[in-house]
């Protein structure tokens, strides 16, 4: 199906087993859209309003949502989730806050501009996913409160900013960092933040997977300093 729906009012759109090709949804209002088992190819959602939408909804009758060569540039993707979706050669430019990818396959996608509270979680707790199922380019992105967890990052070009931290085989590194913070001679600040990694360690990804994030996303200067020291010690411990 090929359609020009630019500027259309289509809030709470529901699509089951759809096949959309060469469709234009630029500047459309698509609040709380939901798709199941659908394939979207060569479509544009530039400046579309997709707030609170579920663009990946797991598996439906044996099929997942697939997005191939789709442009989401400057779309409002606030509180949008992709769960167990397959994305191939898609673009995301300055896509607002609280965009989340959970257990998706992400191939050759490009992220640019300011991106805030963007989380890419491949720990496989919602849907099985290969930790190598990601290749993406963030080199022209500026991120805040950003993370990629549970994937291997050898095919990911990360943002060019100094506060990006990359932890290879991150479960081991974080366990070492958590143990260091709880040592008997920890400082008062270290004791105060001793549980900072507990939530992440509560449901870790594969042992050989990675974790990257922007350190300044922690916000609190004391917390940033404590995290930096703990991770520096943990890196040394993980090599011994």
Spans of model-derived segments:
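Tandem repeat scaffolds
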Residues: 1-175
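Long, ordered, amphipathic alpha-helical scaffolds
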Residues: 154-240
């Amino acid at each position: 199906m090929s359609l020009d729906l630019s500027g259309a009012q289509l809030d709470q759109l529901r699509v089951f087993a759809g096949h959309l090709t060469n469709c234009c949804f630029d500047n459309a209002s698509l609040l709380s859209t939901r798709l199941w088992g659908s394939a979207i190819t060569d479509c544009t959602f530039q400046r579309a309003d997709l707030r609170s939408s579920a663009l990946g909804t797991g598996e439906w009758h044996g099929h997942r949502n697939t997005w191939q060569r789709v442009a989401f540039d400057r779309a409002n993707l606030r509180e949008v989730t992709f769960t167990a979706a397959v994305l191939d050669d898609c673009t995301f430019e300055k896509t607002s806050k609280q965009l989340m990818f959970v257990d998706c396959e992400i191939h050759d996608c490009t992220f640019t501009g300011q991106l805030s509270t963007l989380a890419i979680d491949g720990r496989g707790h919602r849907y099985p996913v290969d930790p190598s199922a990601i290749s993406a380019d963030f080199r022209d992105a500026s991120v805040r409160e950003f993370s990629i967890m549970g994937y291997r990052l050898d095919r990911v070009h990360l943002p060019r900013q100094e506060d990006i931290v990359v932890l290879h085989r991150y479960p081991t590194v974080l366990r070492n960092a958590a143990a260091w913070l709880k040592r008997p001679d920890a400082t008062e600040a270290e004791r105060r933040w001793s549980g900072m990694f507990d939530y992440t360690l509560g449901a870790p990804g594969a042992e050989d997977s990675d974790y990257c994030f922007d350190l300044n996303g922690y916000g609190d200067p004391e917390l940033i300093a404590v995290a930096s020291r703990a991770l520096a010690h943990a890196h040394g411990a993980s090599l011994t």
